[in-house]
A protein has these predicted regions:
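Compositionally biased, low-complexity segments enriched in small residues
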Residues: 8-9, 24, 50
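SH3-family beta-barrel domains
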Residues: 34-54, 65-69, 76-91, 95-120, ...
Length: 169
């Protein structure tokens, strides 16, 4: 009985199909893994305009419009490309996940100006005074003080009690 001779590509085709399936499984697993992130966690507004909605879809009405890139939000729940978040004033609603980023930031709260100091001490040199509502990138916290950067150039230490977004969510 003669042996069947297969064309040279016959061995490659099953391998290519297996490789394609493997690649497809990785591509679909990444978004699923992102959906499984443990909540709560901090996120920052990436977009120049962000709509907060009453439900997890563009079909739901808008409850708030944010025009504050860098504003910290606490992510409370995940749902298919949407995040239930809480803002510094306690307002809650759903936002599109693609408009958020994982970079940590903090916003100045409380009454009056918050001193920004050169070091993490109340007797350290005063660098600037920050109004409530000023947003800065959070670089780290220690012993009741947080190092923040405002507008990419103003660096210093602010008492953690004057910030929202610095603590464990």
């Amino acid at each position: 009985m003669p042996l069947a001779v297969l064309p040279h590509y016959a061995c490659i085709m099953p391998f290519a199909a297996l490789l394609a399936l493997l690649l497809l499984s990785f591509l679909t697993a990444a978004p699923a893994a992102a959906q499984q992130r443990e909540t709560p966690y901090w996120a920052t507004i990436r977009a120049s305009e962000l709509n907060m909605r009453v439900g997890p879809s563009a079909e739901f009405p808008i409850s708030w419009v944010y025009r504050r890139p860098g504003l910290p939000l606490k992510v409370l729940r995940l749902r298919e490309g949407w995040r239930l978040v809480e803002d510094p004033d306690g307002a809650r609603g759903w936002v599109a996940a693609r408009l958020l980023e994982d970079e940590r930031s903090a916003v100045v709260t409380g009454d009056g100006l918050a001193p920004m100091r050169a070091e993490s001490s109340a007797v350290s040199d005063l660098r600037w005074r920050l109004e409530p509502g000023v947003v800065g990138r959070l670089e780290g916290c220690e012993a009741g003080w947080c190092r923040i950067v405002v507008k990419g150039e103003y660096r210093g230490w602010v008492e953690a009690s004057r910030l929202w977004g610095d603590k464990e969510p």
